[in-house]
Amino acid sequence: MLVGDAAEPGNQWVAPTNPYYIKPLPIPAPDVAKAKALLTAAGTPNPVVTLMITTLSERMQIAEVIQAMAKESGFDIRIQATEFTSAQQHAADGDFDAFFWGWGGRIDPDGNISSILGCNAAFNYQHYCNPEVDRELEAARELDARAERLAHYRIVAEHILHDLPIIYLYHPKWLYAHTARLSGFIPYPDGMIRPQGLQLE
């Protein structure tokens, strides 16, 4: 993978190493022949799709890999690099074919999906709405036991991986560097830096 050890490939809203990852639903193997057949059956063997990305060098490199891989199936991906604030506005307005963006991640799995794929969620740029997904997310949110929550998340994952309102690609691994003079630094799984307790000697 282009980002190497700095990220973990994934197909769900949490990484495969996360205890809430639904292991019976792993990353599927590529099937170029099936993709071509589906496009032909749809009457659009060579669709043109504009992929909006933010102007980060890493995003451009990954978008170019997506472009090359999709071309094997017949897609003509046009990359549109857009300044971050403008890209967010285009996304909020629904003014895009496909939008490659990232989410910082939250410690609780609910924070990685409810605000993005809930029917009336603030970051639901794709305007996805599945009432059953909403019900299952709400049910999982009210539980503490992991096994019970996983049962609800399994149903959610089955819907998301079937409907594909989002195609998850990878989960970044948070890397930090600091001077030896800094003490009290604690890395958190969501990547957010908490300044409480930090001391510079």
Label for each model-derived stretch:
Residues 1-20, 57-67, 87-201:
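Detector for C-terminal structural segments
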Residues 32-50:
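Immediate post-signal peptide segment of exported/extracytoplasmic ligand-binding proteins
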